[in-house]
């Protein structure tokens, strides 16, 4: 039987993405958007107990809808988040985020990391698809030059 997962502090908002951890059984990430209710708060959650409890890991991402979250396939502490204004990366499991690359202002609808090539691939609404070498995540100069 299906069981509804409802727990504080998670609001009743549209769930934009659920991503299971590749590293830890029971860990799952969820993004939500309140766009349909004129709510532009940032909603990024992490559960380490199969969804019984949730922790807010939205940290310092600017206000606006969040559409997707993914774990890095090589480094368990790196998270990638696609928002209505671009891509953010956390290198500390969601405690802090920074803008990833020098993308044009774009709604990032989806984000994947190619496991063999270690390339970040994003799909935008109205700006096409973009690719970045995930190995460049720790090099700010390369991040600014390598989206193509």
Task: Locate predicted features.
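Beta-propeller blade termini and top-face loops
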Residues: 1-147
């Amino acid at each position: 039987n299906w069981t509804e997962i409802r727990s504080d502090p998670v609001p009743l908002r549209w769930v934009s993405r659920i991503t299971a951890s590749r590293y830890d059984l029971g860990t799952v990430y969820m993004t939500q958007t309140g766009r349909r209710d004129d709510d532009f708060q940032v909603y990024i959650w992490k559960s380490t107990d199969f969804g019984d409890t949730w922790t807010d890991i939205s940290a310092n991402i600017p206000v606006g809808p969040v559409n997707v979250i993914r774990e890095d396939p090589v480094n368990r502490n790196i998270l990638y988040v696609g928002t209505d204004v671009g891509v953010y990366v956390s290198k500390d499991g969601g405690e802090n985020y920074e803008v990833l690359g020098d993308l044009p202002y774009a709604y990032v609808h989806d984000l994947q990391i190619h496991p063999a090539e270690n390339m970040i691939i994003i799909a935008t609404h109205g700006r096409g698809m973009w690719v970045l070498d995930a190995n460049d995540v720790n090099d700010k100069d390369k991040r600014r030059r390598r989206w193509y």
